[in-house]
Amino acid sequence: MVLTDIEYLLSYLEAHHVPTIKKKRHTYLTYHGLAEHYTYVLKDGIIKNSIILQDGREYNLSYIAKPDVISLLRDEVSRSTDQPFNVRIESEYATFYQVNRVAFWKYVNSTPELQNYVKNYYRKKLSENILRLQRMVMNGKKGAICAFIYSLVDLFGRKVNEGILIDFVVTNDDIAGFCGISSRSSVNRMLKELRTDGVITVKNHKFIIQDVSYLLDQIAN
């Protein structure tokens, strides 16, 4: 059986007995700007990446809900590097491989399969960042919220009788943080409009998307 890039990385770390750490919900793995000696690889769980803006507001970047390297930014040789963003645990627990960052790059430079993973990682992150920027610039508040809700389908969506259940609790504050909206009341108002229009409903604090095409119609591409 041919392994995917991330499956190969996980099996490689297991074979080299790389230690793991476990963190509880709403604790932080790293903070933006903190000097860090390790590279972390999410083994299981859900995390959220964010940065703090100059005005003190938190701007959310992404959820990560499947195994992946948390950050490969910066150079390969320094024993420590400043972390590019905050990493907060959003599931009950999350488990990470904790790899000395210099050792990690030695693994990569000596293993073609890991080199391929790193190349694909950077391509994927660049593509995600460009798409996120496009949606922020080209959409108003409602379009940004519709784009964000639609993005949750791939991460947490599953089919139910009523539509597509987003099987993860996302708060209005989180939505505001992902969409660059400073007023929580704006999020509340637009979510109410979407419920009134039959686009979404809420059950047990989770969204059910009833009209995906409406969301897509609101997103500028």
Swiss-Prot record:
Residues 172-192 bind DNA. Coiled coil: none annotated. SUPFAM superfamilies: cAMP-binding domain-like, Winged helix' DNA-binding domain. The keyword DNA-binding applies. Keywords: Activator, DNA-binding, Transcription, Transcription regulation. Residues 139-213 form the HTH crp-type domain. PROSITE patterns: HTH_CRP_1, HTH_CRP_2. It holds the Pfam family HTH_Crp_2. GO terms for molecular function: DNA binding; DNA-binding transcription factor activity. Induction: Induced by L-lactate but not by a racemic mixture of DL-lactate. Makes part of the larR(MN)QO operon. Gene3D superfamilies: Jelly Rolls, Winged helix-like DNA-binding domain superfamily/Winged helix DNA-binding domain. L-lactate acts as a positive effector on the binding and multimerization of LarR on DNA, while D-lactate antagonizes the positive effect of L-lactate. The keyword DNA-binding applies. Multimerizes on DNA. Multimerization is required for transcription activation. Positive transcriptional regulator that is absolutely required for the expression of lactate racemase (Lar) activity. Controls Lar expression by sensing the L-/D-lactate ration. Binds to a 16-bp palindromic sequence (Lar box motif) that is present in the larR-larA intergenic region, allowing transcription of the larABCDE operon. This is Lactate racemization regulatory protein. It comes from Lactiplantibacillus plantarum (strain ATCC BAA-793 / NCIMB 8826 / WCFS1) (Lactobacillus plantarum). The gene is larR.
